[in-house]
Structure formats: C-alpha cells, structure tokens
C-alpha cells in the first residue's frame, strides 16, 4: 500500500521546489540530503510530501520526546490511512544503576514504565515486522538503544487461519513463548484468558482483544472484540499475533546464555583474585549467581538487560540490535533539527560507557554489561541507507555529508519575513532595552531577552519588575512544567517579557513575540555561536513586526554570519512577496496549543473510566484568570485579603481530604501572589 497524504493545504512558496528536489535525490539514490528550512516555513509538510513520494518505510528522528510527539500527531494527521507509529523511551521515571567510589555508594536501578508508550513501541515494531511498506515511525534517540533481534521476534510471531488444525494447548504454549501471560481473572494488556474452547488475548500492541474459538482441534473463528464491552468489532480469516515484549528468547537460548554467563563469571572472579581484590570477587560471584537462580526459576531477574549479549548470541563488543534493524534495507531516515539530533546521537554511547565503567570495575556487573548500550555514531551511520537532514541551521557534518548541496526553503506560506537585526552598543543597553520593552508592551506584543548567565537573567528580571514591567525568567533551574506554564503566561499576557539564558529552543512557538534582545552578543561561545544566534533570532520570525536587537561593542564572526544570512533570506522573501503580491500575515495561534492538552486528556479519562468530573483535576486556565478584569483592578490590600481567604479555603479543603480542590486553591494563590508583585 502506498502512502496517502491527506491535507487541506497545497505546497506553496519554496515548498514545491524543495519537495521536488528532495524527491528527485531519493529517486537518484543520493545517500544524504539537507533541507535548510527557516522557522515557520512548513518543514513538516514538506517532509510529509517527500515521504509520500519516496514510498519507503521511514524513520523520522527527533532529539526529544516533546517534539517527537508533535511530529507524531502531525504525521498522523497527514497519513490517517497509513501506519504512523511512535517510538520513544517508555520510562516516566528512570534512575540508572550506578556506583560512586568516592562515597562507596551503590545506587540501584529504579524506574516507572508508561504502559501507553510501551504499547505504541510494540505497535511500531509489529508494523515493521508485518512487512508493510507504508510505515512511518517517529522516534527519539531511543531508536539506537538495544532491544531483541528481528530474527527472534519474527520467529515468535504466531500465524493462525480460520479452519486451521491446531491443538489449543500447543497454541497456548506458543503464546507463553511470545511472552503473553495467562490471567483468567483480570485480562490486562499482554495477557490471555481461557474459557472452554475460547481464548481471549489482550493484545500488547493495540486496544483490542483477540477472541479465538475452537471446534475440536480446528480454529472456528477469529474475532477482534472491544476490550470493555467484549462486543465483536470484526472477523478475520487469518491473523498474525506479534510478541508481547521487545525482548523474546527461547528455552534453548536461555540455557546457552546461562552456561556462557557462568563461564564468564569464573573468569571474572579469577581476575579479581589474581589482582588481590577478594571483596570484588565475592561481590560479583554472589550477584551473578543470584541472577542466574532468578532466571532459572522465573525466567528473568533485575537488570537482565546487562546479560542481553548472551541471550542475543552476540560476540563481545558486537553492537546490539535496535529499531533500525527492523526496517527493510531500502528505507528512509529524516532527522529533524539535525544540528541538535546528530550530536545527541554521538554523545549517547560515551555517557552510557562512563556510568558502567565503575559497575564493572568494582564487581557489580560482568564486562558483558558494556554490550547493553546505545549504538556508537559510526554504527548508526553504517545503518543509514538514505537520509534527509532537516534544520534551519545545518551543522558542518550534515553539509559535508550532502557534499555541500543544500535544498533551501526560505519562503513562509504566511509571507512573514526573517526579522531585521539591529546592532547597538552595550553601553546603556538596559535603559535602551527598557524603552523597547515599553514600546512593545503598549502594542500588546511580547519580548524575549537572552543573557549569558542564570544570575544575569534573575537580576535583569528583578530590575524590570522594579520598573513596573511584567517579567519572568526561565533557565535550567526552573522545572520543565513550570517553564511551559511561564511561556504560556507570556502568550496570554500575564508577562510582557521573558528573560532566559538559552531561549533558542528548537520548536519554541511564540507568535506574540515581536522583539528578541540578545545581550552581550559579541561574547563568542556556545550561546553566541552562529547557529545559536540564528536560532535565537528565529524566535521573532513568527510575528509581522519581528525584530532582533544585538547589544555588542564589536561584530564577531558569528554575528556577521547571522546578520548576512538573515539579510540574504529577508531579501529573497521580500522579492517573492513583491512578485506574488503577498502581504505578510500575522500568525494567530490558539493559546492552549503551547501546552499538552491536559484538559482534553482528563475529559477523555472521565469518559473512559466513567468517573465524575470532581474526581479529575483539570488545570485552571491561566489565561482566563489573568484576563479577569476584577483581578486586574484589585488594589494591593484587596489582593492580600483575597489571598488570605483563598488560603483558608485551601486549608478547609485539605481538612476534608479534598486534595484536588485544595490544589486548585493553591494554584489560585500562586497567581494572586504574582499579581500582587506587580502592584
């Protein structure tokens, strides 16, 4: 089945030529191409068109979960009739195993797995194993981490047909080998139940239950039923049941692995004794022997992934299997924000190796633990068949890979131009900045200010607050969810200014921002490199009045490159707009869209679990509260009284054990206190 792209939009501006050039390159067999797309030019839509034209299974790689989720939703919208999957880390919380020699502290692995993401990961692998060609997997760097091999997974697939003669007990053993668990009481995901001649299987990779009925030794019916009502959804003549876990093995492989582990244990104990360290020898002996007993009795143990090399039958140092091994040979990779994603892929191996070095050196793990790892960059690179690097600021590596050939996408469908860049002396920069902020504030526009240090960000914010400017700051010490909330508050108008150290976040979408001010722009370094300056300047490219001010006493090479490149793009965009009679249009974006749809998710939970609304905590609308004219017009004493009354209501709710209501009062207090600071 081919990809079927569904969209109400048609390619415009630079999109048609970008789609054509990239598609032609893929058809020619070009190994690497670069799409240089400016902020807001519709790179995702271009990527979708290229994927549809290529007609190849595609991996879309993003550098973090949040942007991967955005891409996943967009791709699902573009390809509703095709297999669009999501493959990211399934840990809600993860504390890796570690040993700190300086304090003789051993830290056990601790984790919490997100069942929904686990299901999506299994669905991605199942779609690839099915042989479908119309598969798009949107992934984070999790795709380079170890998992079970494709051959073992393929051998664990259970193929059944209506009318097939198959002993029910033989089938049940196959289910167990595919890591499904029998549970006749609570049919959870990855479990099966047996009642007479009927077997119900809660599929590990979907929301449905598969019901198989026998007549004697013959399969009589294969049906998909609703997991809640058990009502029949559809019937099948044949069906493929995929494993319930990404790590499958056979009894023979397990037996062989135990023998090899015991052999390596003997060698490691001998090594520690030879260097005169009996404590480490005793430690590794006790730990591994305990793990072996657990594997023999239960089939698994804590930290079993550290023995994955033995179960996979790999040699020492051989790379682990990963998601890329499940793609056919002729597949496409699209690396989004490649200037960030490529270095991130390169860094994964080193960090993992450094942590495990102490575990092996001090007798907590066998050396085989080193082989449970992410791919080295060279190994990842070898698995690439064809790749498109996508970035507004491609790095030297990507340009070198594409042999200097770059497909540019500079025209925005909205007609918006790259912002003007103004360089001003750093003397009296704060006073000048304050004047600019007041000008924007009077036009109901927002301002981003970047500093070099956290302390500077905090002090500048304090200065602005003292001058009656509604400001806040974000940096690495501010919690992630708080950062998102602060940015949302900026959009709705609680703040006019947001100060930060590194506001060049790829994907940061704030169309209300008309001014980006860069302090100390001439201080060369990571935060003031050509790419960082270009990314930061791009935050003003979504506003029709977008402008960038660089405060500097000299023009560095990085500044010169950014200014010249922005001017070049701006002239091309101006010319295009004049030739086509386009007037730049301000982007109007739903305020709620910057945040995850917590309220919608909660309402779905209400419907799914049949809870009452009072049982679900819905985040209060920050914008609605901030825009309340009564709150805005309150005097300082009135705000103080309101805070005091709300505190009493919060305490009363807590006494009644109504913690959800108490949390809502708490959030109201926080916002009232912020309003009080502005008085």
Roles of regions detected by a PLM:
Residues 1-36:
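Conserved pre-motif I regulatory segment
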Residues 478-500:
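Conserved helicase ATPase core of P-loop NTP-dependent helicases/translocases
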Residues 27-34, 56-57, 133-135, 445-446:
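Pre-Walker A (Motif I) flank of P-loop NTPase domains
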Residues 80-89, 303, 446-448, 460-482:
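Conserved RecA-like helicase motor-core motifs
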Residues 57-69, 86, 280, 440-462:
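Conserved strand-helix element at the start of the C-terminal RecA-like helicase core
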Residues 151, 453-475, 671, 675:
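Conserved helicase motor "Helicase C" RecA-like lobe of SF1/SF2 P-loop NTPases
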Residues 28-50:
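Walker A/P-loop
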Residues 34, 87-432, 436-442, 461, ...:
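N-terminal cationic and glycine-rich segments that engage phosphates or anionic surfaces
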């Amino acid at each position: 089945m081919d990809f079927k792209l569904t969209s109400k939009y048609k390619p415009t501006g630079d999109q048609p030529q970008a789609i054509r050039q990239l598609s032609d390159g893929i058809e020619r067999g070009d190994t690497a191409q670069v799409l240089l797309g400016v902020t807001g030019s519709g790179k995702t839509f271009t990527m979708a068109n290229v994927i549809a034209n290529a007609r190849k299974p595609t991996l879309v790689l993003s550098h973090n979960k949040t942007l991967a989720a955005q891409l996943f939703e967009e791709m699902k919208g573009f390809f509703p009739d095709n297999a669009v999957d999501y493959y990211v880390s399934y840990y809600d919380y993860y504390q890796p195993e570690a040993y700190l020699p300086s304090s003789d502290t051993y830290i056990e692995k601790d984790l919490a797995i997100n069942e929904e993401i686990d299901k999506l990961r299994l669905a991605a692998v199942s779609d690839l194993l099915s042989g479908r060609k119309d598969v798009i997997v949107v992934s984070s760097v999790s795709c380079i981490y170890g998992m079970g091999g494709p051959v073992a997974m393929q051998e664990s697939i259970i193929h059944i047909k209506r009318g097939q003669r198959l002993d029910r007990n033989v089938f049940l053993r196959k289910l167990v080998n595919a890591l499904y668990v029998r549970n006749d009481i609570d049919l959870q995901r990855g479990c099966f139940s047996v009642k007479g001649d009927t077997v119900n299987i809660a599929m590990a990779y979907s929301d449905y239950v598969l019901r198989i009925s026998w007549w004697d030794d013959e399969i009589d019916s294969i049906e998909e039923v609703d997991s809640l009502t058990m009502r029949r959804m559809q019937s099948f003549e044949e069906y493929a049941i995929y494993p319930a876990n990404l790590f499958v093995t056979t009894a023979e492989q397990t037996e062989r692995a135990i023998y090899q582990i015991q052999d390596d244990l003997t060698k490691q104990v001998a090594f520690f004794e030879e260097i005169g360290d009996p404590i480490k020898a005793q430690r590794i002996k006790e730990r591994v022997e305990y793990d072996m007993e657990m594997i023999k009795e239960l089939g698994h143990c804590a930290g079993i992934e550290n023995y994955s090399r033995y179960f996979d039958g790999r040699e020492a140092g051989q790379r682990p299997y990963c998601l890329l091994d499940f793609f056919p040979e002729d597949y496409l990779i699209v690396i989004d924000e490649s200037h960030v994603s490529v270095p991130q892929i390169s860094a994964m191996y080193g960090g993992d190796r450094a942590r495990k070095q102490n575990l092996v050196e001090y007798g907590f793990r066998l050396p085989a633990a080193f082989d449970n790892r992410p791919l080295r960059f060279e190994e990842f690179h070898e698995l690439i068949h064809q790749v498109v690097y996508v970035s507004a600021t491609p790095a030297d590596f990507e340009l070198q890979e594409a042999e200097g050939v770059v497909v540019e996408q500079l025209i925005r469908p909205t007609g918006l131009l790259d912002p003007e860049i103004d360089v001003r002396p750093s003397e009296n920069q704060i006073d000048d900045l304050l004047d600019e902020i007041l000008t924007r504030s009077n036009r109901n526009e927002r301002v981003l200010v970047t500093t070099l240090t956290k302390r500077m960000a905090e002090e500048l914010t304090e200065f602005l607050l003292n001058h009656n400017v509604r400001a806040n700051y974000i940096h690495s010490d501010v919690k992630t969810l708080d950062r998102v909330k602060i940015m949302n508050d900026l959009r709705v108008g609680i703040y006019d200014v947001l100060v930060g150290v590194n506001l060049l976040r790829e994907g940061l979408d704030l169309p209300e921002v008309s001014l980006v001010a860069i302090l100390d722009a001439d201080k060369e370094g990571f935060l003031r490199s050509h790419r960082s300056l270009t990314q930061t300047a791009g935050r003003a490219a979504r506003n029709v009045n977008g402008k960038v001010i660089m405060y500097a006493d000299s023009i560095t090479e990085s500044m010169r490159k950014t200014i010249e490149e922005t001017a070049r793009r701006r002239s091309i965009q101006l010319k295009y707009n004049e030739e086509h009679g386009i007037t730049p249009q301000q982007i109007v974006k739903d305020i709620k869209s910057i945040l995850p749809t917590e309220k919608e998710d909660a309402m779905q939970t209400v419907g799914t679990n049949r809870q009452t609304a009072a049982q679900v905590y819905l985040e209060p609308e920050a914008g609605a509260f901030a825009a309340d004219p009564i709150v805005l017009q309150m005097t300082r004493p009135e705000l103080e009284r309101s805070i005091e009354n709300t505190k009493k209501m919060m305490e009363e709710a807590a006494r009644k054990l109504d913690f959800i209501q108490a949390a809502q009062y708490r959030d109201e207090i926080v916002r009232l206190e912020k309003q009080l600071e502005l008085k």
